[in-house]
Every structure is written in C-alpha cells, then in structure tokens.
Amino acid sequence: MKYKRPFSLAALAFLITACGNARSEEIGAVDTVFKFIGPDHKIVVDAYDDPKVAGVTCYVSRAKTGGIKGALGLAEDKAEASIACRQTGVISFGGKPLDQQEEMYSERISLVFKKLRVVRMVDAKRNTLVYLTYSDRLIDGSPQNSVTAVPVPAGTVIPVKK
C-alpha cells in the first residue's frame, strides 16, 4: 500500500510531460536493410503539428534500427535527422505568447540515454518561426542537426513572451 502514492505521482508526471509535447503521425517509411529476424532497418517520416502554432506542420525523417534489438526497443538509432516545416493552414497562436525558444517535441531513440529533439525559435525581426532538430545524450550530444524556417504572413505578428 505504501507504494501507491509514488507510483501515482510518477504516472501523473509522465502524463503531464507527454501532454506538453506534439504528437507524431507516421507518414511513411522505406526499408534500407533487410533483417532476417525482426523488422528491417528503415527511414521513417513523421509529421508533427506544432501544438502552440495552428497551421504549421513539421516533417522529420530519421533512421530507425530494426532487427531483434529494434523490435524490443533496445537498439540505439542513429543521431541523424532532417526536418522540413511548412504552413499547412492559416497560422494562428491561440492568443498565447510563445517562448523565444521552446522544445516542441522529444522522443527517446535509445533505451535510456539518447533523445531526438525538435525546438521552435522565434525570429521576431523577420516574423519567422525557426525549427531545429538534433539529438542529445546524457553525456554528449551529436553536432548533426537540421534547420527549417516558416515565414509568418506580414499581417500576423508572432506574440513573444517578454
């Protein structure tokens, strides 16, 4: 009985963290290496709708390790990703100001230590949203990254927290 509260708090913390990030939707995948046992190695393309900016979707391609380790979630995926964000509808901000820089999405790409991250930055001078993807580890990250920008129409001002 004494373990219920810590478990409940951990579950609540996980749900709060999960709800803050964008959700991915797999658009497609291509196999790159055939694996006799387990899924093949592949490149996947996922779509992420920006949770705080309606009308912007980011597409991220990345390698996904197959085989038995990949199927069990024990494999470490490569730290290489590419990103392209586009205006997919009318851009709006829901009346809430954005942080100058904010993590939009993160996903575990190894059992414990490595994450793929997508960060949104605001270039207020050029009225543009800049999106960066990179991976990091507990000890050191990878310098490999990819960046894209979405210009916001001139009549729409990006609200930024001061």
Label for each model-derived stretch:
Residues 57-122:
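Mature extracytoplasmic domains of secretory-pathway proteins
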Residues 125-162:
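C-terminal partner/receptor-binding element of secreted or periplasmic proteins
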Residues 1-9:
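Bacterial N-terminal signal peptides that target proteins for export
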Residues 43-47, 56-58, 118-120, 128-133:
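Broad, structure-driven detector of short, well-ordered beta-strand segments within folded domains
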Residues 10-11, 22:
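Cleavable N-terminal signal peptides
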Residues 22-66:
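N-terminal export/targeting and maturation segments
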Residues 12, 51-52, 78:
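Residue-level signal for mature regions of secreted extracellular proteins and peptides
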Residues 17-18:
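C-terminal motif of bacterial Sec signal peptides marking the signal peptidase cleavage site
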